[in-house]
């Protein structure tokens, strides 16, 4: 497993990462400052399966953030925390605002700017961390002809290209959900096709940890 004793993992992102965490940065166990999403599940699994490793999990997600917003606070809420590992999960609102607020272009982040924002954050992260996770944005819409799904796929592709270019760990949440929805309807996870319930949080945590050499069956 790639996370070592004493490592700190900072998860940055939007509401999908935030999920009720303490803002701007949440960590610890009292009153669930890590929120109720995939970050909480990841820490649960790390602690229960690797209790001998003191791994510090930090949630730096803020609801409503676009890549522009996250970049503006990246130095303060991510880099300054001296993380060993950084996860960047952003882009859903970059796309969503184009559909739920089409008359307000100042809230939109288009593909070229998304690529620039992601590039700058990845370059900052690579300078200070052992490793960087690039998590794709997603929409829980299996119909690839859906307009918002087609747009989201453009941003997912940018993540794939940047992860390869900068040798980051790619966590493809869109592909993970697509596989799940071959068996279950998206309403099982989220009525708005974005914010996951506990089943979705568990799926996302499992997908993330699958990239980390995590062993659920190791003896303690």
Per-range role (PLM):
Residues 11-13, 18, 59-62, 89, ...:
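Short glycine/serine/threonine-biased micro-segments
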Residues 2-5, 36-56, 65-220:
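Alpha-helical cap/lid subdomain in secreted, periplasmic
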Residues 2-32:
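Short glycine-rich His-centered loop
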Residues 29, 33, 61-62, 207:
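Conserved active-site regions of diverse hydrolases
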């Amino acid at each position: 497993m790639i996370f070592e004793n004493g490592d700190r993992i900072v998860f940055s992102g939007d509401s999908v990462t935030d999920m009720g965490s303490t803002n701007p940065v949440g960590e610890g166990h009292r009153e669930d400052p890590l929120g109720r999403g995939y970050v909480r599940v990841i820490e649960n699994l790390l602690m229960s399966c690797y209790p001998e490793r003191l791994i510090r999990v930090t949630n730096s997600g803020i609801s409503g953030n676009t890549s522009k917003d996250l970049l503006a606070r990246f130095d303060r809420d991510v880099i300054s925390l001296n993380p060993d590992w950084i996860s960047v999960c952003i882009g859903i609102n970059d796309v969503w605002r184009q559909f739920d607020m089409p008359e307000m272009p100042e809230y939109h982040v288009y593909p070229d700017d998304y690529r620039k924002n992601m590039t700058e954050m990845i370059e900052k992260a690579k300078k200070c961390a052992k490793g960087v996770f690039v998590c794709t944005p997603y929409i829980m819409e299996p119909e690839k002809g859906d307009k918002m799904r087609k747009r989201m796929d453009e941003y997912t592709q940018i993540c794939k290209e940047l992860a390869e270019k900068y040798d980051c760990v790619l966590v493809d949440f869109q592909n993970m959900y697509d596989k799940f929805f071959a068996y279950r309807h998206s309403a099982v996870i989220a009525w708005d096709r974005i914010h996951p319930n506990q089943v979705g949080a568990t799926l996302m945590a499992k997908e993330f940890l699958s990239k980390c050499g995590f062993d659920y069956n190791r003896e303690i």
